[in-house]
Structures are given as structure tokens and as C-alpha cells.
UniProtKB/Swiss-Prot annotation:
HAMAP family: Chorismate_synth
Pfam family, one: Chorismate_synt
Function: This reaction introduces a second double bond into the aromatic ring system.
GO CC annotations on file: cytosol
Name the record gives this protein: Chorismate synthase
Amino-acid positions noted as binding FMN in the UniProt annotation, renumbered to this chain: R125, S126, S127, N238, A239, G278, K293, P294, T295, S296, S297, R319
Cofactor: how bound: Reduced FMN (FMNH(2)).
Amino acid sequence: MSGSTFGLLFCVTNFGESHGPAIGCVIDGCPPGMALGEADIQPDLDRRRPGTSRHVTQRNEPDQVEILSGVYEGRTTGTPICLLIRNTDQRSKDYGNILDTFRPGHADYTYWRKYGLRDPRGGGRSSARMTAPMVAAGAVAKKWLREQHGITFTGWMSALGELPIPFEDESQIPLNPFYAPNAAVVPQLEAYMDALRKSGDSVGARIEVRARGVPAGLGEPLYDKLDADIAYAMMGINAVKGVEIGAGFASVAQRGTQHGDELTPAGFASNNAGGVLGGISTGQDLVVSIAIKPTSSIRSPKASIDRAGAPTVVETLGRHDPCVGIRATPIAEAMLALVVMDHALRQRAQCGDVQLPIPPLAAQAPRTETAPATPPLDAGDDIEA
């Protein structure tokens, strides 16, 4: 009831606060027998962790994961898996000036109105730090999905503020702090962020994420649709203000002759649907895009009120990301993995014995003309990054 648990069969309960002793999660429903150790989880946490470049918060947390339960002799037991990440670099004194005031754009006011009190240290429970346990849980889901179904997840930044990032090469994504699939634009992004940081301002971003190898049939009718759960998961990420699946809002300007993904014996002709029809996966890539708002914690003074309702001016101290989108790629991948994992287990439970006389369609029919090896969107998609 408290909004800290995600999933039905692969169930993740998130706990902790930004400046508490530790954060973590409990995973219930992971199948037994999978080889699992901290080394399987740590790489994704390292991709998300703060202090890795001058363009993100300088809070320097090692984010070393500890497996406290649910694993015996290197294999999952089928019992709850508790993952712990200790906080080591809190600076709570930085928040002394906002004990009685509300930071515009933050959850300070809404938490206070709901609970009658709030933890001002780093945002407490509303901090983006609470995404670290979800990344850890997502790494567990990714491993099972990769081993059982061959499903993989890839995310990248497609826009930083008003700067579009044209897709060029997926191999470039892990080689720069922006997760940009285009090495040529990285110097421009670096200069943009340097100027932004000096001005004391912040900016938003757009992140794309895909799941490849998802079998057809995942998802439920009506209220447990796969795409509905994806949108729910993505909106649970801090600072996300919009979600698109497939062509998304570009569908408004498309005609039916453009948008409908034709089926051929050789496979689907396009993927405007983003891999989901009627709430159920088609066997194509799941194509998701999220919009992330500018960071609310900025050095520039902003008008607000205090707890008595009197006007005041807030200047935010502390260490903050000038663009939270820079570290959002592994978070979006993790949340998508958690949704797919949950639905894979649900499909196995209810429809695992369903057999059909013909094999599933190919995710994409063979191309008839020269095209990039890894386009930003599948043939037929009319949305722009």
C-alpha cells in the first residue's frame, strides 16, 4: 500500500533513504537454480553510480552491492533475495537551510502535505538515489531473461536539452558518460554541460531503451497490458515526465496506411507499435522512449514558501546532477527488464503449455534496400529522436 513494491510474480520491494545508513531491495519470486553473485549485479550499478564524471553529481558513492539472502553456494534458492547498498558519502549539513522551506520542483511540499513531515536530507525517500536498488534488481532480471530467453536490453541518450543526438553506432554507447551512440557529438555535449554547470542551471534529456529477443505473447488483456506496465514502470523513475512506446506521439500525425505494421510471411514490415499490440508482445523489439525534466536542484535563487506559508527564496546547496538524464540509461533498462521478467513468469505460469502449428513471425522482414546495420528505430517508424 505504501508504493514501495513493484511487480506481481517477480516482486521487488525497495527500501531506504538518500542519507540513511543504506538502501536496498528484496526480490521475491526469482526462480531457483540461477548462478548469481555480486559480480553479476555490480557492472550495472557502476554504470548508474554518482561521481563518475564532471557532468554528474560529485557525491562519490561506491555503490557496492551485498547479497544478504536468497543465494546458496552461488545459486538462487527461490527464496527472497535481499540486496544491500550502503550509503557512505552523505553530507546532510548541506540541507540545513531548507529544513523549513520547500524547494520548487521537488517533492518537499507534497511529502509534507501527505505525511505531515519530511526528510529534507537529499530528498529522503524521493531521491533519485532510490533508483540504485532497482538497477540491482534489474540486473538479476536481465541475467535470467538472457539465459532463459536470449533477451537483451540496450539504452542510449537521444537528446540532451535542445541538442539531438543522431544514432550512429551502438558500440559507442558505453564509451562516453552520456551513453550517446554517436562519438562525433560527445565534444559538443561536454561543452554544453560545462557551460550549463557554470551558469548554475540544469537541463532535461530523452532516453531510448529497447528489449531485443522478447517472445510473442507476453502481457495481459486490458488492465495488465505489457505497454501499460512499461509506462507505469518508466513513470516510477525520478524526473520522468513522459513515456512513448513505438511511434508514440508521432502516431498523431501518421495515417493508418503508415502506422499499421503489416505482416508478411517473412516477418513484420515495420514496428510503429513498439513491439506491443493489444497489450501483448509481438515478438519484435520493445521500443520505449522517456522524457526527463531538468533537475530541480539548481544554484539559481527561486521563489517559494516556508512551512508557515510565508514567502521566501530558496538557494539549493549540496551536490546535484545538472542533468539527471545522464545517469538514467541503466535505470530505464532495469525498469524495462523488471516488467519483462514479471510478464515472462506470468506467461510461463498461465500459458506455458500453449502450442501453435506455425512458428512466430520474424521481428522484421528482410530489408530490400541498403539501411544502417543498427537504425535508431525499425523500418517504418516515423518518430524522430
